[in-house]
């Protein structure tokens, strides 16, 4: 009896060992396979199919069986004709940009625009579905410059704002040949903000010294812990005004008909008022644009998919959320 129990125990250990070994091998294989598959790529989606599938489902749900047979027969003939005309159709490339403080989406935007420029001709168009409340000037300046590549190549750019294109977001939008805004989308905020807390008095109360040494009078203007002077404050304000002038001149260059002095006081407006001020060209939504162009254009959504490792994704998410929170509390200079 003891021998049988010992044998069963030994057998259980062997089976457990085999299961653990196989699990470890599977885990290693999965990790190696994932590493091979971790690569960035351009994803292309034919948006026509989505709209047509929804439309057809609704139509079929209202038909009788006899009507369905007739409809399917007509649809086959229609599909054959569309297949012949497909290559001659103009293309509408659809991009999405949901901006954060640093305009990190510009990494994908530059790749998407480069891909479009390789295949697009002057009859094609680009629709950018934009959503951004602005951020750092160098990030949004680069994003606007990427969009300007389309303009320089003579490819018509339409920007659709369903929710918000303010400050740096509007810097991007103004590059477009045509701006469409939802009635209550937030538009404008053409201004620059800079603010920073100063803990110098608190440090003195706690008997803590803070030393700051620079080579160059304006290597640092306002600091969080140093003693800020009137001259450094003036320099800080001068930098903000210089940035604002550059911002205004860029918008004026892109939209010459705009009364820049009237709209560049940092104020924002809803879409309907923005139309009156010529900040946008039409009231509508991105869905209106896509449906109106569905018959004439082939709708292609272009997405840059950046594959990250699990650890990289986690650390990037934590860092991004932390920096977003801190920047919302402590705004600093050159902030659109």
From Swiss-Prot:
Any idea which residues are catalytic in this one?
167, 219
Q: Which GO terms describe its molecular function?
A: serine-type endopeptidase activity
Q: What does this protein do?
A: Possible protease.
Similarity comment: family membership: Belongs to the peptidase S49 family.
Enumerate the subcellular locations listed in this protein's record, separating them with semicolons. Answer: Cell membrane
Q: Pfam families attached here?
A: Peptidase_S49, Peptidase_S49_N
What cellular component terms from Gene Ontology apply here?
A: plasma membrane
TM ranges: 10-32
Q: Which InterPro entries match?
A: ClpP/crotonase-like_dom_sf (IPR029045), Peptidase_S49 (IPR002142), Peptidase_S49_N_proteobac (IPR013703), S49_SppA_C (IPR047272)
Q: Which SUPFAM superfamilies match?
A: ClpP/crotonase
Q: Protein name, please?
A: Probable protease SohB
User: What biological processes does GO assign it?
Assistant: proteolysis
Q: How does it sit in the membrane?
A: Single-pass membrane protein
Keyword annotations from UniProtKB, A to Z: Cell membrane, Hydrolase, Membrane, Protease, Serine protease, Transmembrane, Transmembrane helix
Q: What is its EC number?
A: 3.4.21.-
């Amino acid at each position: 009896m003891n021998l049988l129990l010992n044998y069963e125990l030994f057998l259980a250990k062997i089976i457990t060992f085999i299961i653990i070994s196989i699990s470890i091998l599977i885990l290693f294989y999965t990790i190696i396979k994932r590493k091979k598959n971790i690569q960035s790529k351009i994803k292309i989606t034919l948006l026509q199919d989505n709209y047509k599938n929804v439309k057809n489902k609704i139509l079929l749900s209202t038909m009788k069986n006899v009507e369905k047979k007739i409809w399917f027969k007509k649809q086959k003939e229609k599909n054959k004709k569309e297949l012949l005309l497909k290559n001659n159709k103009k293309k509408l490339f659809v991009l999405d940009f949901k901006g954060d403080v640093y305009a990190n989406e510009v990494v994908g935007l530059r790749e998407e625009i480069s891909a479009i420029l390789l295949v697009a001709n002057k009859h094609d168009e680009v629709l950018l579905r934009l959503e951004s409340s602005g951020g750092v000037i160098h990030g949004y300046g680069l994003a606007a410059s990427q969009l300007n590549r389309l303009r320089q190549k003579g490819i018509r750019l339409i920007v659709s704002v369903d929710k918000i294109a303010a400050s740096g977001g509007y810097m991007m939008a103004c590059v477009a040949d045509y701006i469409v805004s939802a009635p209550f989308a937030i538009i404008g905020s053409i201004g620059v903000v800079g603010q920073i807390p100063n803990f110098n008095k608190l440090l003195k109360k706690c008997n803590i010294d803070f030393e700051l040494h620079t080579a160059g009078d304006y290597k640092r203007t306002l600091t969080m812990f140093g003693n800020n002077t009137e001259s450094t404050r003036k320099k800080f304000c001068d930098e903000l005004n210089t940035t604002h002038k550059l911002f205004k001149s860029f918008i004026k260059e892109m939209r010459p008909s705009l009364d820049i002095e009237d709209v560049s006081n940092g104020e924002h407006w809803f879409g309907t008022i923005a139309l009156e001020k010529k900040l946008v060209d039409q009231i509508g939504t991105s869905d209106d644009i896509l449906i109106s162009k569905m018959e004439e254009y082939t709708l292609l959504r272009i997405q840059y998919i950046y594959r990250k490792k699990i650890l990289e994704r986690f650390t990037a998410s934590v860092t991004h959320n932390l920096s977003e929170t801190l920047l919302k509390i402590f705004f600093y200079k050159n902030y659109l």
